[in-house]
Amino acid sequence: MAKLAGQLVEALDGLLGVPVPLRVQAWDGSVAGPPGAPTVVLRNRRALRRLVWQPNELGLARAYVAGDLELAPGTDLYETLSAVARFAERPEIRTMALGPRDVIGPRGRKALGAVLRAGALGPEPTPPPEEVRRAQGRLHSRSRDRAAISHHYDVGNEFYGLVLGSSMVYSCAYWTPEAKSLEAAQEAKLDLICRKLGLRPGMRLLDVGCGWGSLLLHAAKHYGVTAVGVSISKEQVALARARVEEAGLADRVEVRLQDYREIADGPFDAISSVGMAEHVGSEQYRVYAEGLYRLLVPGGRLLNHQIARRPDIPGEPHRTSSFIDRYVFPDGELSPVGSTVARLEEAGFEVRDVESLREHYGLTLREWVANLEAHWTEAVRLVGRGRARVWRLYMAASALAFEQNRIGVNQVLAVRSTEEGSAGLPPTREEWLVRPAAGVPAATPVVTAAETDLGDSRSVR
């Protein structure tokens, strides 16, 4: 047993065909692997058994969330995840799809021998309770979407407050030179959205996926609009309504527990969708885009703030993160920004501006991780150690993904032009960022429920 770690590292290197960029400390205290590399600790045989049954990202995630795998004292989380990400992007690893048969088959003979000597062969361990087992219902039906949103957003408003800070904004901040704190950077982002939308007193704003109401409050306080926000998270809606009441804005801000496909009281002068479209899904994106187009007045603007993935590599299958789908955002789907622009224009919008905020999201996520770590004991009390570990892992890994250009985030400004073709924007970008467009768009008749309820029908791609 004294050489257990060495046997495991040798077996793993043989199975993968290339050296793994990590040191491994086994439960017997032995350590092996490249000197100076980040060190992971297999605390028990169950950790190894999880990796035998799922020799991939999901197996590592399950072991970490369950507490069977740890980082050695002094090992940096970001350094470890960065090493793993670089390794996973190697062509010979990126195209590899390992399963338990590879471990017990001829290719994994050394690995199987090491597992047997370690006494770790046995039934597959039960996944941690934080994992989503099997989603019920048709993909992106209203009931399945409600369950997916509840899994992530209904973990407790107090927990979100620890992570997000007082702004209660769950999307990337805007780190201007003047923004010296997370709260200031989030306020700068909210104001950027309001300026891009050209908000001014008397306008009617719809915020799709309004979260805890921060954008609604900012727009009503500083731009004089009346606003409607919708979310299908019960806990978000409850806190957003309380914040609206506390701010004395209940006469101008309404927060609804409502699916975006059920909004039936347009038109709106402006629509914002910030960090919500990732939950729509590719098959429903046309329904989403066409629905927002119908709810907007001619001359009105849409601000669609959305995370984007890189385009698929030609000749390779599309890959999704099993950890993110099982633990973080069930049924979430990312699309390349070009696909988002095309879908919006197919729905009738004219896209006028696309701004990448990729680096801003990396900075924001690092702030959230720091908040979580600073309040770790309280976070564990609120949501349990396993879920707190999920959040630490997902946010740190996401920060690196943005920083290393594996994913991005974009604000897409689109307009519903008038019949005459007017977009209602000043002639230069600089102008419409600092002041609203002149004139008030003509009101359009209120759309009836029968015309707007979009249902659960599958759209044609």
Locations of regions flagged by a protein language model:
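Conserved class I S-adenosyl-L-methionine
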Residues: 201-209
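A short glycine-rich, Lys/Arg-flanked "PGG" loop and its adjoining helix->strand segment in the class I
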Residues: 286-298
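Substrate-binding/catalytic lobe of Class I Rossmann-like enzymes that use SAM or dcSAM, i.e.
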Residues: 307-422, 432
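Feature captures hydrophobic
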Residues: 1-180, 185-186, 192
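A short acidic, Gly/Pro-enriched loop at the edge of an enzyme's catalytic core
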Residues: 261-271
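Conserved beta-strand signature within the Rossmann-like core of class I S-adenosyl-L-methionine
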Residues: 299-307
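Conserved SAM-binding loop of SAM-dependent methyltransferases across substrates and taxa
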Residues: 212-223
